């Protein structure tokens, strides 16, 4: 029995030694290994969380910038359409002005041509009147062999011209 008791004591002593060794080892591991590992893991978790937050912020900023760019693009398209419309309106206005000016110039030319034609007609009539008067006087002088006085000559001319105007 004594051997068994010694064996139990040895077994109990070894167990106690192992337990104390384990506790010391656990304390050393806790102090030198577990804390730095958990701190490193916490830092890593914090960094990952920050990276995720940063990525989310970057994505939101990118979406905001994309929306702003789309809005600016829409605004620039509207501005371009407005500029084109203004240019079209200015072109139409200028075209209408040019047409009105051309029509006025054409009417002025037509009126001037009519005046010139009437003046030429009047000049031709006066010239013809003088020529006819001179020819009539010559013919009458030769036929009558006498000179007509101015009043007779004027009456003869007026009668002849009235006859010409009626035939026109």
UniProtKB/Swiss-Prot annotation:
GO molecular function: proton-transporting ATP synthase activity, rotational mechanism; proton-transporting ATPase activity, rotational mechanism
Keyword Ion transport: yes
Keywords: ATP synthesis, Cell membrane, CF(0), Hydrogen ion transport, Ion transport, Membrane, Transmembrane, Transmembrane helix, Transport
Gene3D superfamilies for this protein: 6.10.250.1580
Annotated InterPro entries: ATP_synth_B-like_membr_sf (IPR028987), ATP_synth_b/b'su_bac/chlpt (IPR002146), ATP_synth_F0_bsu_bac (IPR005864), ATP_synthase_B_chain (IPR050059)
Transmembrane segments: 10-30
Disulfides per UniProt: none
GO CC terms of this entry: plasma membrane; proton-transporting ATP synthase complex
Domain of life where this protein originates: Bacteria
Localization, UniProt: Cell membrane
Predominant cellular place of this UniProt entry's protein: membrane
Region (Disordered): 61-80
Membrane topology: Single-pass membrane protein
Protein role: F(1)F(0) ATP synthase produces ATP from ADP in the presence of a proton or sodium gradient. F-type ATPases consist of two structural domains, F(1) containing the extramembraneous catalytic core and F(0) containing the membrane proton channel, linked together by a central stalk and a peripheral stalk. During catalysis, ATP synthesis in the catalytic domain of F(1) is coupled via a rotary mechanism of the central stalk subunits to proton translocation.
Subunit field text: F-type ATPases have 2 components, F(1) - the catalytic core - and F(0) - the membrane proton channel. F(1) has five subunits: alpha(3), beta(3), gamma(1), delta(1), epsilon(1). F(0) has three main subunits: a(1), b(2) and c(10-14). The alpha and beta chains form an alternating ring which encloses part of the gamma chain. F(1) is attached to F(0) by a central stalk formed by the gamma and epsilon chains, while a peripheral stalk is formed by the delta and b chains.
UniProt family annotation: Belongs to the ATPase B chain family.
Name of protein: ATP synthase subunit b
Organism: Limosilactobacillus fermentum (strain NBRC 3956 / LMG 18251) (Lactobacillus fermentum)
